[in-house]
From Swiss-Prot:
Ranges of biased composition (kind: Basic and acidic residues): 1351-1361
Function: DNA-dependent RNA polymerase catalyzes the transcription of DNA into RNA using the four ribonucleoside triphosphates as substrates. Largest and catalytic core component of RNA polymerase I which synthesizes ribosomal RNA precursors. Forms the polymerase active center together with the second largest subunit. A single stranded DNA template strand of the promoter is positioned within the central active site cleft of Pol I.
Gene from which this protein is expressed: RpI1
A Pfam family hit: RNA_pol_Rpb1_1
Protein name per its UniProtKB record: DNA-directed RNA polymerase I subunit RPA1
Amino acid sequence: MGSKRAMDVHMFPSDLEFAVFTDQEIRKLSVVKVITGITFDALGHAIPGGLYDIRMGSYGRCMDPCGTCLKLQDCPGHMGHIELGTPVYNPFFIKFVQRLLCIFCLHCYKLQMKDHECEIIMLQLRLIDAGYIIEAQELELFKSEIVCQNTENLVAIKNGDMVHPHIAAMYKLLEKNEKNSSNSTKTSCSLRTAITHSALQRLGKKCRHCNKSMRFVRYMHRRLVFYVTLADIKERVGTGAETGGQNKVIFADECRRYLRQIYANYPELLKLLVPVLGLSNTDLTQGDRSPVDLFFMDTLPVTPPRARPLNMVGDMLKGNPQTDIYINIIENNHVLNVVLKYMKGGQEKLTEEAKAAYQTLKGETAHEKLYTAWLALQMSVDVLLDVNMSREMKSGEGLKQIIEKKSGLIRSHMMGKRVNYAARTVITPDPNINVDEIGIPDIFAKKLSYPVPVTEWNVTELRKMVMNGPDVHPGANYIQDKNGFTTYIPADNASKRESLAKLLLSNPKDGIKIVHRHVLNGDVLLLNRQPSLHKPSIMGHKARILHGEKTFRLHYSNCKAYNADFDGDEMNAHYPQSEVARAEAYNLVNVASNYLVPKDGTPLGGLIQDHVISGVKLSIRGRFFNREDYQQLVFQGLSQLKKDIKLLPPTILKPAVLWSGKQILSTIIINIIPEGYERINLDSFAKIAGKNWNVSRPRPPICGTNPEGNDLSESQVQIRNGELLVGVLDKQQYGATTYGLIHCMYELYGGDVSTLLLTAFTKVFTFFLQLEGFTLGVKDILVTDVADRKRRKIIRECRNVGNSAVAAALELEDEPPHDELVEKMEAAYVKDSKFRVLLDRKYKSLLDGYTNDINSTCLPRGLITKFPSNNLQLMVLSGAKGSMVNTMQISCLLGQIELEGKRPPLMISGKSLPSFTSFETSPKSGGFIDGRFMTGIQPQDFFFHCMAGREGLIDTAVKTSRSGYLQRCLIKHLEGLSVHYDLTVRDSDNSVVQFLYGEDGLDILKSKFFNDKFCADFLTQNATAILRPAQLQLMKDEEQLAKVQRHEKHIRSWEKKKPAKLRAAFTHFSEELREEVEVKRPNEINSKTGRRRFDEGLLKLWKKADAEDKALYRKKYARCPDPTVAVYKQDLYYGSVSERTRKLITDYAKRKPALKETIADIMRVKTIKSLAAPGEPVGLIAAQSIGEPSTQMTLNTFHFAGRGEMNVTLGIPRLREILMLASSNIKTPSMDIPIKPGQQHQAEKLRINLNSVTLANLLEYVHVSTGLTLDPERSYEYDMRFQFLPREVYKEDYGVRPKHIIKYMHQTFFKQLIRAILKVSNASRTTKIVVIDDKKDADKDDDNDLDNGDEVGRSKAKANDDDSSDDNDDDDATGVKLKQRKTDEKDYDDPDDVEELHDANDDDDEAEDEDDEEKGQDGNDNDGDDKAVERLLSNDMVKAYTYDKENHLWCQVKLNLSVRYQKPDLTSIIRELAGKSVVHQVQHIKRAIIYKGNDDDQLLKTDGINIGEMFQHNKILDLNRLYSNDIHAIARTYGIEAASQVIVKEVSNVFKVYGITVDRRHLSLIADYMTFDGTFQPLSRKGMEHSSSPLQQMSFESSLQFLKSAAGFGRADELSSPSSRLMVGLPVRNGTGAFELLTKIC
């Protein structure tokens, strides 16, 4: 037992603590003092005192034993050390030292905060260490009140009693529990980090104690410096010094003196801020030592040679890169010692070599040379941490390079374990093996082996295997005795094999021997295909040994789980080496248990391609077989059964005994259902729709009535008592589809039965297809002459729609001549970057109609051969292979080719391909292919088709790395989340993330039938198979059920009585008694409570009220009772189900009252069986369920299908925004607010007002004339006339009026224009101010040199273009520009400048508004306009300014610019500035649109977010249903729970666009994890900072940074997270590791 305990101590660590060795501890650990950088002598022997001294252990090919422990191979190595000449900073702590020095005065060494503030911080840190997290947080809230009270002795201890009772209570708590390191959670870690960071914030400029200027220490160029003022220098060197202030480098020994003084004053504070100071086992308080010496290094540890082995290049020994760093340190240390020796005794004591080294040092004086030598030593020590910290060090590996990145020590070796007993080869398909089998080549079966203990029961079999030896299967490779010694079985010595076999059980005293036998049929192997994106990527298969094969043989059904095909894919096989591992592989990881995908609970396994065709042909009506064929096919499907097969009677007796194809399948189903279970009943549908079977007019029945709809048609599948009565079985029933036959068999009888059925179907379909055959011919794709003529006619028409599409995009009423249309099209392309989008939309809308006409003409009625005789249609409609799009491309046309959702772009020449003319309007030039594969396509069409294929390949290649990193971030954060025995979901530090997994506690794989009407019908039809009487009797507890039903009745009664608006009792009390509150200044805020005085008066009244009155209020306005599952745990109380399940039961009972008790019992039993099992690693499954489907998404940003091209970020970029970045500045923020009924007109006005408008949207043209004037000096003269569009043109889109435009021009725009001109002309702002001269007459200038002028952006077309109002496509760039404009917007952002819509309900007819406003505001605003004009004219550059005072449609300005400046390009400046100048904008909102939602509601959608602005329009908008995609904005406004729901909805919406479904339980778990601490935290390095496991942090990324933090704070890792346990070689505590098994031996 003693040895067992010792093994537990060493092999099974319980926790791991990070600390720092002191110099004394390093010397004690060291076995040699390293004094020379020379490693080997001329003979290749290690030099004593060198870096490969034999006392530190053997190295490389050295055969000498270790000089310390005298071992050779087993020597772990021993540390050495280097004595440094002077202290250097420990590079781990240098930044922390800098932050620490900033809060202390370096004159008096006092802390720069009040004593009671310091005491509170210390108290908070002690509370956190003791595990009192809530109390520490309360103290943080309480701190502001205490700090506000200006009493220094507020928290001082007097006679053992605290002055403040709250503080006293905290100290009493600490007396109970001073330190509890096991309470380390992510909450405590994040709170401790926050408090520490706040305590280390830089404070005032002068010391609060000695009143001297603070020396703020900075970290510059990897050194600590502080600024020395002139006064400091004069004080040191005398009053006559004239030197100015300068930066002074702080030497390590000087800094150490500072910190020792600080520690002497504040030992407890420093130990709490830097816990590592109190962890050392060495007494650091004796002599001149101090715990803060840990921040510095006098002695440098040297790693053993085994950690830096020598490299052999041929016969030459080559040093390790890390050894080179140590050599550099030794050399620099030697030079430093030379300088120190010189400073002590002069040159006389130096050797010639030392003198030479001294002279080569940079610096004039000895002190300067000492600084140079010390700095070199410090840099070389820093390189030991990170080689990138030195520019000179080109090679070498620091600690950072050793442990970080994928190839680093942690991820490559400590996390990535390499395994034996594995095989890898190519996979090939095999339909003849079972679904849960894997075909293994016999060469693998002989090499892989399994250890079997020899017992009396298996010795005979094992002896035969030993006799066969390693080369004959089944054989054995070697025998292992009780001591672990292995004896290889010889292949060429039969007599020795015989003797080894006889000795297997010869002497029981020798202990149990173990025979390593070959792989046998039925052994389980773990198959894995990389990338392993989700749980089914590794499954357990039973081995089937195949002789003469070289590849793995895999069943088709498993391809989807592995995402495998047979085009050269390779897979790995792993052979479990213990009975526990085999048990898990057989029962948990096996194929039968992985039939459903954890992502959404849908099936993974299913038959494909040929088997689907065969199944349809076999089960089609009219297919009959004689007795021989019937029994042959049944035997093919059931050959693996080891019991009597039940056969069905024939369908037809006369004239011949025949069985239908349906009966063959029915026989298989009946025989596979286990004995004792009721047979399956199923009503379902086939994939082939009923209309496809109606190829001719139905024949009226001889007797009876016509069946209605699809009744009794082949599209309706009906199974009764296990017999297929109606319908064909196609992909819908035995493919990887939800609620098909295989899925229903899985639900009723389990995975083994469904897997067996799949295997049986595979074999019978394979055999039948060999009899029946299947092929495609040209006849299957040909269309009739009539259809082909119609097709050609439609194609001729569609080739001429190009001009119409362009005219519609240009908004031309009449279609102009072709040449003129091309010119306008070219001008539109140049002018408006959004024109292409509009043109694409017009082309698509026109061409879609023609495409649909062609398809409906040719398919399916236009085909020569009709379904089901048409094999291509049979293949597509049954789901075997292909889609209707493929058949259309073959027989009809290819249609429009799109690249990233757009038509192929034009080159700079205006051509899409060189074979087209510039700006050609034909659909063909835009990628519309009217050809088909049957008759061939043109070269241009082929090129467009290849472009689309190339886009898919590029997108796949690029997104792989993005989605891979996304999944890694998810996995590393969520790896510790698992279900516990109380059904809560907790992290590895025991933090509760969810009280019920997925909010209902149900496992996704077991709850797929808790769904719709079909599921309830199916479950009741098969109630006898689900509700087995014995099980129901054990589960059903009438007493428990009565309690649950009483609670549910209580909830129902509350729901009936609940008022329209839910309010609390206190709210009603306040409304009734608000008149009785009498307080002075009722609206004044109490700074202590944050409440109004009036509200505090109401609270006092409520507190004074009688208990009976309060009880009456509470009874009348009672809250809704808690849900049943919150009161009665589902695993303990029979009948406790979620609200959703309760609703399903109630709805079904209303439809079928007779089955009320049946469906209720079914759902209750299924709830208990479907609960998530304790130990289930739900975090990993959720991460995989997001990461795996993300590989199917593209990287592009798609557009909102509405007016104004509202951009919406989708795909991986949006997932990264939400999950990895948790960004508060998302790329496309938006709001969706429903419009109240009857408010559409007012909502339209609001939409117009919300649209942001730039000056470019309002300008018709700008005319610029350039001249030269000579008076008063030579200068350029610019005359600019700005002509604005009439308001009728833009009033439907923008809420700005002409008067406001003019006001914006002379108040803001011209200031910006002058500033831009001066900037381009290299004129500084200072020059502009200095050059101002006396005002000259504006009209005095000559215009002798006037140009003809040019017009910027003249537009003769209609200017009502939505797209021109849009800002730049690049949202990020737009954001930057908006930030840059903030200072400019201050000039015009007051209420007079920008029209604001206060209440749209007050607006009357627009025409009246216009007239009244223009007339009414003129008189009020004239003064403001005149002053603005005066300010503009006061600028020296402005010579004249005038504007249209009547209609406000133009303004004109004349500017002068000295010829001393570079002549600017005004055209480009104005164009750029007009596009950036915002005339009107509601803050943070660019534009708005109105669209119709899913429920036919009208919604207002905004590009940008301003929730506060929306609150002003509560009469128009339904603010109770406001939604925004900005999670931070929702969290700030509505709280973190609302934000959590937005995360779920947003991630779900991202996947929904691609037709991907992810179960809500996964999303809710991720959302709850990200909002765990009340804030929205990303799944990134920033979010990982809050983890309580340092090893988990280091295994993610930035390993060195997290290692520094763990060492500095002296953190301990309890080895509870999966990553930390893997790193130290322990099994993870999830899954089967969550518990231990106790075996009953006797």
